[in-house]
Amino acid sequence: MGTRLKVLRVFKDLHRTRRDVFRDDNRALTAARVKINEEFKKNKNETSDDNIKEMLKMARAVETILRESVIQAEHVDENKIVLRPRKSLLLENVPYCDAPSKKT
């Protein structure tokens, strides 16, 4: 896949993730959109393949962190915050085993 296509794919993926992560939060949606667009415009004249690969790697890492780590919270009262985790972040209870497993 060409470099230009990779850049466009990461750009679109970041915006999709932004829309999913910050759903119903216009302030965060706008701030994230501005930041993504600003960073891509700042580096649009980059020609070094090594630098482009590093920037793509960074963009993928940012997209992964947004998708896997960010949870929305909303102030509903002076001392209350409601968390709105996405279904993709919820995990089933996993049994915890404190005893080391025996090697055979």
Swiss-Prot record:
GO terms for cellular component: mitochondrial matrix. Keywords: Chaperone, Mitochondrion. One of its GO terms (molecular function) is protein folding chaperone. The gene is LYRM7. Its main location: mitochondrion. Interacts with UQCRFS1. The keyword Chaperone applies. Belongs to the complex I LYR family. Assembly factor required for Rieske Fe-S protein UQCRFS1 incorporation into the cytochrome b-c1 (CIII) complex. Functions as a chaperone, binding to this subunit within the mitochondrial matrix and stabilizing it prior to its translocation and insertion into the late CIII dimeric intermediate within the mitochondrial inner membrane. It comes from Danio rerio (Zebrafish). It is found in: Mitochondrion matrix. This is Complex III assembly factor LYRM7. One of its GO terms (biological process) is mitochondrial respiratory chain complex III assembly.
